[in-house]
């Protein structure tokens, strides 16, 4: 009898071990997540690194005998130029050369009619036209807090004798550093 009890006990012990071996096992670990953000800016609501539209300076329509014509650089929405950069950056706008700089006395820049006529003009950082924005002039903005900043750029064209009617244009390069 004792042998029978031992065999039954041994069998039960074996079953217990077998069922323990088949029981689910839990292991633990972790997933590492990451995201790398780089500083960026938007100009008038658009991002990118080349070909951005910094706005348009429209002097309007005047007769060919005008003395001065004033305008302001307007962004895409009709307001002033808008710069939105990552928090912690200090953006600066560099207004580079135009296509016709120095081609007409009376201004550092010039609008061209595509034939042989130029209208001189200059850019300014104030509406009163007292703070000249020279070629390669830099406008440094406040440190960004993630809120769009307004950049005001004004222009004043100067009339001169002998200008024929027509459309006069110029293209100015602009750089945004942040």
Predicted regions and their residues:
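Solvent-exposed strand-loop boundary residues in beta-sheet-rich modules
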Residues: 115, 127-129, 178
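Contiguous segments within soluble domain cores/interaction surfaces
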Residues: 117-121
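N-terminal small/polar-rich segments of proteins
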Residues: 23-109, 113, 137-178
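N-terminal signal peptide c-region/cleavage motif recognized by signal peptidases
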Residues: 18-21
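Predominantly extracellular/luminal cell-surface or secreted proteins
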Residues: 96-98, 122-126
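Bacterial N-terminal signal peptides that target proteins for export
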Residues: 1-11
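Solvent-exposed adhesion/ligand-recognition segments of exported proteins
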Residues: 105, 128-135
């Amino acid at each position: 009898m004792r042998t029978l009890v031992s065999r039954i006990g041994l069998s039960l012990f074996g079953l217990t071990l077998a069922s323990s071996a088949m029981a689910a096992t839990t292991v633990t670990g972790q997933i590492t997540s990451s995201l790398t953000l780089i500083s960026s800016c938007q100009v008038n609501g658009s991002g990118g690194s080349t070909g951005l539209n910094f706005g348009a300076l429209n002097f309007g329509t005047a007769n060919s005998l005008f003395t001065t014509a004033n305008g302001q650089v307007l962004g895409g929405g009709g307001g002033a130029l808008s710069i939105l950069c990552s928090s912690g950056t200090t953006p600066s706008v560099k207004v580079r050369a135009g296509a016709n700089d120095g081609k007409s006395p009376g201004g550092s820049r010039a609008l061209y009619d595509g034939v042989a006529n130029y209208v001189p003009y200059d850019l300014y950082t104030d509406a009163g036209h007292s703070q000249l924005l020279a070629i390669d002039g830099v406008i440094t903005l406040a440190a960004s807090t993630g809120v769009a900043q307004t950049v005001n750029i004004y222009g004043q064209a100067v009339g001169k004798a002998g200008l024929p009617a027509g459309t006069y244009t110029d293209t100015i390069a602009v750089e945004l550093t942040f």
